[in-house]
């Protein structure tokens, strides 16, 4: 009898051990989920943790900064909505995927450059896109982009209040404030609509804080007693002395292409610059931060928080009076640099700081690597996994290539240009025969106020950067023809 009990007890212990081992193995091999929160036009330093705006409160964004990795030198390949979003999705440069300006006709060549979400679908993921897409203005089911099982979006910039939306091909008018609507849809999909047996990938891509920067009514009086602090490095004192003439013309108030006389140096503008609109942008961030907090809470309630890679970024930077500018597009730091925070406790230690230069085309390969999916050959970015682990990747890039194509809708914003940026230097070439280029020493002049392009002491550095530009253009197959894909699209439309 005693031996029988021992046998039974041994069997119970055996099966218990096997069961626990299987559970542990399952937890180790369980694929991570992905939550990608993308804000529109958020300056890299418009966050509470930066201290740039002492009154700014972003507790949930700050929590993400504490809990994961802050990629302090994260840049977009082109600083404008549509091109940057397409690059995030495809891992390719705008001159490759074809969306190199905000144009109502153009999508990426999806058949050649599938979004990372399509590869996740093939790997067993359930995927959703909630929010702005801002590519070709398509309607009905044509508006649904490849790679998503659930779709909730809108055409172009959309609207802040009571927006017209597209849900899985059905168009209707929603009621409320856009940030809240998108948050509710994302949470509804997480809790009620997805297959709980599958790993998921959710894009929550906000319209805010894009101009006209309309905050939620509950935040309209936020910070009303506060003053905008002057920018670091006194960049608001810009006079454009020694800088390209096209920038002085742009600032002076007429089309930079017009052959009109312009002073060699402009008077300093009084601070604050664009006070009302910039304060409203900061107010818009409150609803964004609340949204992030709500989704994080839902993930925690679902037991999926620590198994979800949370990514927070912006499609481009934004000028808040630096160099007297508003908007983005140009090759200044405030335009091309964006916040990038990533949390994944299984891999990333708390308070990780990454100094290396990373690009928006690096995100898609990184997501695929974490999901156990091989990077397709067309993706030009690199997995950031080694950096996220806290390692020192000796083979990581030493320079980046930035590009801008003159926008057909906003031609006065600036000419087509490229920039090469290293840890210390930046060269900007606007391809203008009758104007000068730009060269900045980012170590000694982080505000990019002193153009060194005509300084003989920097001739060797200038040539090195031009050689680097040539190398990068070959590496990334740079195509200066802005309209190559647009012409194909419009030609095909004429045939219909």
Model-derived features with residue positions:
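Loop/turn elements at helix/coil->beta-strand transitions in domains of secreted/extracellular proteins
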Residues: 30-35, 67-72, 122-128, 146-150, ...
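Active-site segment of extracytoplasmic enzymes that catalyze sulfate/phosphate-ester chemistry
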Residues: 22, 36-39, 43-129, 138-139, ...
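Extracytoplasmic/secreted envelope proteins and their assembly/folding machinery
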Residues: 58-61, 86, 113, 117, ...
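Active-site-proximal cap/lid insertion segments
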Residues: 24-29, 41-55, 154-177, 189-198, ...
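C-terminal cap/loop subdomain of S1 sulfatases and analogous C-terminal strand-loop tails that border
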Residues: 23, 135, 145-150, 155, ...
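Bacterial Sec-dependent N-terminal signal peptides
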Residues: 1-29
